[in-house]
Amino acid sequence: MLVVIAGAGRVGLGLAEALIKEQKNDVVLLDMNSRAVKNAQAFDMLVLHGDMLDRQALVEAGIERADVFIAATDKDDRNVLACGLAKHLHEHRGVKRDDLLT
């Protein structure tokens, strides 16, 4: 399963690690923060520097063929917008961080 995660912070990186450990998932992690991207590159996944609200960044991350998109940044408004954009680019299940905390 291809999972695209926007946000390489504690929540996003933790989800990515858990999904990679299952060994059934390909994970792409996307973040605007250069330091977060560098830290995440230590794991066995594709890590991209980019904005989750940038159509081209999502396409580069593989959103058009992704099975799941997870917006896990600490900015709820951006998470919601990113889920909408991801859904527009490819019909799949969008999950935002708030859904994970309930």
Which residues fall in each region the model found?
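Cytosolic regulatory regions of ion transport systems
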Residues: 1-102
